[in-house]
């Protein structure tokens, strides 16, 4: 019954989510020019180069930018630069949707491909400048780069209506964040042939991923970032030098930016500030923006920030990224897409020398926007008596209002989901109250649930949720020290010391970042990092204490566990070192030699490879060896346990948890592996304290474990922002032909590894001293997490309804709701219930 209530609550949250993230309504059909003002296109060819995650300062700031050719062109006026604001969610798919259709993306676009009225994942049937170029202007389009474009505009064999947008194409995979070299070379290798065949295409689109991958891997100030800037700059130079730039418009843009950790998806200034540059010889004859005209030099030297002052990433003129859509449409004389919310960039109007033509273009943009306002603005019939600047200002106001009202909530689903959540939570509380007496532990549980529930009504509390769990965990340890003599404090002091180290390991929360966190210090000292990792892996894999058994048969089983865990730990360490080498990180020479020797053993014809290539080649096979061995050993262990009828369930669960811990370390970033050493210390000490001082109080163990699940999730770098989702370990052992569901599961395991570790914490106490059946023990241990989660859920759903027009509804509350869904389904059901049920059945 309790499990059914948990599933029902998850369904209620999903129902609410369907109402909160509804499919966005779009206008059907395609726009057409009114034909009243005939004009020729300003340019004949268009080249669009998208550099994924190219933040504005990467292009314009003297302290970081290496785009030397772009700087030359900005200085002589043949390049016009802008800071392009990209609306959140700042991930590639919704941003490409905005860049091509001019529409504001729904937040759900960051999670579900593209959800439109026809429930299709493509934009083939929706109006876009690509559709206009292809169908109304007869342009031939070629594309090479991020295969997200091919999801939006699938080739003919992938769609039923036999439409296709690209005459020639090749996609590169966008999620192998470890690769920032080959992924770009796979795009660049097409350029020479395209330059030879300029008569056979009109539009060329290139989308480079390497810079984004460097950001994810090593942050915006990585040592690889400068060379990548220069590589991208050389590509622009090559295109510019070999194309006819009088008749060609070259647009260089980022689809979004990145934060100071190198991630994106949120709404920080760095994530929403993408660079954009238009290049053509023709532009030199006209005036750029006044901000560019007044700039003294390129790249721009920005004054140092004062203490506490945040970087704005505002360079030159700031525009909306979607403004590129009506601008390109007008310059190439095609209709502005029906669902466009962009406003033509005013500086480009001067390329139309006839003032009446400029007014006609502005009128087209105004009337197109008016079609989206549901009659709130009037269609413009005449162009004689208006001032262009005034109309553009009014269009900006319309744009702002349209962006705010882009989503219509499905209120019936919102209220049904919220009502069900409240009813189910009330039922859970009622059932819990019938079985549990009120004492200090239950009071602490209810207080934590109430505190965390109330906190979701504040946007800052959501952004800094880690602070709550820090004070809760330290408060609980300090409370345990009350009435203890000084000599008994030692173990508590050690726990507090370990907690403080964990607290300072990574940047946590969304408001503040610090340079000197432990993870960054370790990255700067490779010897300390890797020796700590070796010690951690050894401690995790060779924890002899959990392998002590009574009789001869089980002792033999324990010895086999010791060998298996030792082998898995060794492979884990070698793989993490190998992974770091492949990603351009330095490692101690000794460990480099170990990896090289290992690679020579597992790669066929190893003597034919250079050292570097040999290590690269060994990466995926080494990971697959680990996975095969892990699952073979785990299944064998459970079968042997069943065969020999090992009755001590607590010991069996402890051994299984050791195997899973090794797997979690394997899925953890190198700089976070050391956390598990302190997890182990806290685990051993607190289990001893609960057994000795609290007579193995299972409820206290469960509550303490839950707090640590949340606390360590945030202190390992997690937040309530999509920007901190780590993909770097989602592809361990995966080649290009991957299963998205497997990768998704691996991503969840990687990001929630500390949480999964502490979900097993109470097993050693709960099952070792159980006075009731296994199943009654299981249910009793699950109530506290369900109490906390359901309380938070009820409050969060209410907060999303009450604050649905809040300024931060999409940047703070929506990501929190998405994270809550993951906590409910992945952690609350998959992690908390399924493994334990399967183990109890054996």
From Swiss-Prot:
Any one biological process term the GO annotation gives: GPI anchor biosynthetic process
InterPro entries tied to this protein: Alkaline_phosphatase_core_sf (IPR017850), Phosphodiest/P_Trfase (IPR002591), PIG-G_N (IPR037674), PIGG/GPI7 (IPR039527), PIGG/GPI7_C (IPR045687)
Keywords: Endoplasmic reticulum, Glycoprotein, GPI-anchor biosynthesis, Membrane, Transferase, Transmembrane, Transmembrane helix
Membrane topology label: Multi-pass membrane protein
GO molecular function: CP2 mannose-ethanolamine phosphotransferase activity
Database matches in CDD domains: GPI_EPT_2 (cd16024)
One of the record's GO cellular component terms: plasma membrane
Cellular localisation: Endoplasmic reticulum membrane
TM region(s), chain numbering: 409-429, 442-462, 468-488, 524-544, 554-574, 615-635, 698-718, 740-760, 783-803, 821-841
Primary residence: endoplasmic reticulum
EC number from the UniProt entry: 2.-.-.-
Pathway as given in its UniProt record: Glycolipid biosynthesis; glycosylphosphatidylinositol-anchor biosynthesis
Positions of glycan attachment: 186, 441, 506, 551, 578, 771
A Pfam family matched in the record: Phosphodiest
Family: Belongs to the PIGG/PIGN/PIGO family. PIGG subfamily.
Function: Ethanolamine phosphate transferase involved in glycosylphosphatidylinositol-anchor biosynthesis. Transfers ethanolamine phosphate to the GPI second mannose.
Name of the molecule in the record: GPI ethanolamine phosphate transferase 2
Higher taxonomy: Eukaryota, Fungi, Dikarya, Ascomycota, Saccharomycotina
């Amino acid at each position: 019954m309790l499990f059914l209530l948990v599933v029902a609550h998850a369904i209620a949250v999903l129902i609410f989510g369907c109402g909160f993230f509804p499919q966005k309504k779009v206008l059907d059909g395609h726009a057409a020019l009114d034909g009243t003002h005939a004009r020729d296109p300003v340019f004949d060819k268009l080249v669009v180069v998208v550099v994924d995650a190219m933040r504005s300062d990467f292009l314009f700031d003297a302290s970081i930018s290496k785009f030397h050719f772009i700087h030359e062109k900005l200085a002589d006026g043949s390049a016009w630069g802008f800071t392009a604001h990209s609306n959140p969610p700042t991930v590639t798919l919704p941003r490409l949707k905005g860049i091509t259709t001019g529409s504001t993306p729904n937040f759900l676009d960051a999670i579900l491909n593209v959800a439109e009225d026809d429930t299709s994942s493509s934009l083939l049937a929706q109006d876009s400048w690509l559709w206009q170029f292809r169908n109304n202007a007869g342009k031939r389009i070629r594309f090479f780069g991020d295969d997200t474009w091919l999801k939006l505009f699938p080739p003919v064999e992938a769609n039923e209506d036999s439409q296709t947008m690209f005459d020639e194409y090749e996609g590169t995979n966008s999620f192998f964040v470890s690769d920032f070299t080959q992924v770009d070379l796979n795009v660049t290798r097409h350029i020479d042939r395209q330059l030879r065949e300029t008569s056979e295409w009109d539009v060329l689109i290139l989308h480079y991923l390497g810079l984004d991958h460097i950001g994810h891997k090593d942050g915006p100030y990585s040592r690889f970032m400068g060379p990548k800037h220069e590589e991208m700059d050389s590509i622009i130079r090559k295109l510019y030098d070999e194309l006819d730039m009088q008749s060609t418009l070259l647009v260089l843009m980022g689809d979004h930016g990145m934060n100071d950790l190198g991630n994106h998806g949120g709404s920080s200034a760095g994530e929403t500030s993408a660079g954009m540059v238009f290049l053509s010889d023709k532009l030199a004859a006209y005036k750029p923006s006044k901000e560019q005209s007044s700039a003294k030099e390129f790249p721009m030297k920005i004054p140092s920030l004062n203490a506490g002052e945040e970087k704005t990433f505002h360079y030159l003129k700031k525009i909306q990224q979607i403004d590129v859509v009506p601008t390109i449409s007008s310059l190439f004389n095609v209709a502005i897409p029906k669902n466009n919310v962009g406003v033509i960039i005013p500086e480009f109007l001067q390329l139309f020398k006839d003032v009446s033509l400029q007014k006609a273009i502005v009128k087209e943009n105004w009337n197109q926007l008016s079609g989206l306002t549901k009659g709130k603005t009037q269609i413009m019939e005449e162009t004689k008596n208006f001032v262009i600047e005034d109309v553009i200002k009014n269009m900006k106001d319309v744009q702002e209002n349209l962006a705010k009202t882009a989503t219509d909530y499905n209120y019936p689903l919102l209220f049904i989901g919220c009502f069900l959540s409240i009813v189910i939570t009330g039922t859970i509380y009622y059932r819990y109250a019938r079985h549990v007496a009120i004492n200090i532990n239950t009071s602490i549980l209810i207080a934590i649930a109430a505190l965390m529930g109330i906190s979701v009504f504040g946007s800052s509390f959501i952004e800094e949720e880690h602070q709550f769990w820090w004070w809760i965990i330290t408060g609980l340890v300090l409370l345990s020290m009350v009435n203890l003599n000084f000599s008994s404090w030692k173990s508590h002091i050690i726990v507090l010391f370990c907690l403080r180290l964990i607290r300072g390991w990574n940047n946590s929360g969304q408001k503040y970042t610090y340079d000197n966190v432990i993870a960054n210090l370790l990255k700067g000292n490779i010897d300390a990092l890797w020796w700590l990792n070796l010690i951690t892996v050894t401690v995790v894999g060779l924890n002899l204490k959990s392998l002590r058994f009574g009789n001869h048969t089980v002792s033999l089983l324990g010895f086999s566990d010791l060998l298996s865990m030792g082998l898995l730990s060794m492979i884990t360490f070698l793989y993490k070192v190998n992974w770091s080498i492949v990603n351009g990180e330095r490692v101690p020479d000794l460990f480099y030699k170990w990896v090289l020797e290992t690679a020579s053993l597992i790669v066929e014809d190893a003597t034919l490879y250079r050292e570097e290539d040999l290590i690269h080649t060994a990466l995926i096979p080494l990971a697959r060896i680990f996975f095969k061995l892990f699952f073979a050993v785990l299944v064998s262990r459970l079968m042997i346990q069943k065969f020999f009828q090992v009755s001590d369930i607590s010991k069996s669960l402890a051994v299984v948890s050791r195997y899973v811990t090794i797997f979690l370390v394997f899925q953890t970033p190198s700089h976070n592996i050391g956390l598990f050493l302190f997890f182990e210390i806290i685990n051993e000490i607190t289990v001893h304290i609960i057994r000795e001082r609290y007579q193995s109080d299972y409820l206290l163990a469960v509550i303490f474990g839950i707090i640590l699940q949340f606390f360590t999730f945030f202190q390992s770098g997690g937040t309530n922002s999509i920007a901190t989702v780590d993909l770097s370990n989602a592809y361990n052992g995966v080649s290009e032909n991957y299963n998205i569901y497997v990768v998704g599961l691996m991503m969840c395991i990687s990001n929630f590894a500390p949480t999964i570790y502490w979900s097993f914490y109470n097993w050693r106490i709960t099952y070792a001293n159980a006075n009731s059946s296994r199943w009654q023990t299981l249910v009793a241990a699950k109530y506290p997490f369900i109490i906390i989660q359901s309380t938070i859920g009820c409050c969060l759903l209410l907060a999303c309804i009450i604050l649905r027009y809040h300024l931060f509804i999409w940047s703070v509350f929506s990501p929190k709701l998405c994270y809550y869904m993951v906590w409910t389904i992945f952690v609350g059901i998959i992690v908390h219930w399924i493994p334990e049920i399967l183990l109890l059945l054996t």
